[in-house]
Amino acid sequence: MVVCLFSACNDDDDDKIPQGPAITYAGKLPSRIGDYTFVYDDNNRCTQVKNNSYVYGEIDYDKGVVIMDDEEAKVSFNSDGYVTGISASWNYNEDGYSYKGSGKISFSYNGNGQLVSYTESSSESGKEDGESFSSQGSYKATYTWKDGNLIKVVTKEESTEDEEKYEYGSTCTIEYGEEKNELGQYTLGQAKVLDMEDADVFALGKASAYFPVSYTEEYYEKDSEQNYENEYSENMTYVLNTDKTIKTEYINGSPYSYSYVAIDNDSDNLKVRSLLPSDKKNLNLRSFFIRHHGRK
């Protein structure tokens, strides 16, 4: 997940106990989409996202924290159960390398429960190979909706390390077909546009009203050595189950299968999915917060 199992409290959420989204599609929860596996608690809330054995993070709703590699970030939700932000700090010192920093992320939604903005800021200082460094970074994404569909995403990333500046920006446009998304299910393609796989379990607001069939991303990056521009596009098609859930999504012709677990309050199915492989790997807080830094 370029995870967004996280959230930092805003003023409106200070007195609320984190609940988290518990959304089902035709009485089922997505258990696997492509290489991503989703783990749920007894209240049908997603507690973990994995990519094969790689664990992006685990959420403790009772404590209101996300746990990444035994570290905690505070988490909260708005009244609809959608993630509203993240804040955390880190301090590592090992084998001559040291990193001390902090980061904050916030999400906002419109009155229809659709994600409209994502902002991120972080700063860090430390030593690598005996050399000191300091860096700051910011990232902002804005989302434009029309007729219930996400049609455009604009991002801008800026970072500075020891006075050297880096900038990255992109504009992504999304096209839709005539097939209605009757269950309001997030697709893998749309989650990729958001750069956050948590969208697949409804943690980031409502999905588009129709199934997206393509997106085109124009992007640039520049620093002291380059000024680069390029374009990238993907096409999506779908095969649905009889209950209108997605069975297979094809992205540029490659199939991504969807698996589900039926909701049964008397079953241990959801608990069983919480078991982790012995070779699991974890994303730490620092890796998550500096992923938008243009560090070399």
Residue ranges and their predicted role:
Residues 11-296:
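Buried hydrophobic residues that stabilize the cores of well-folded domains
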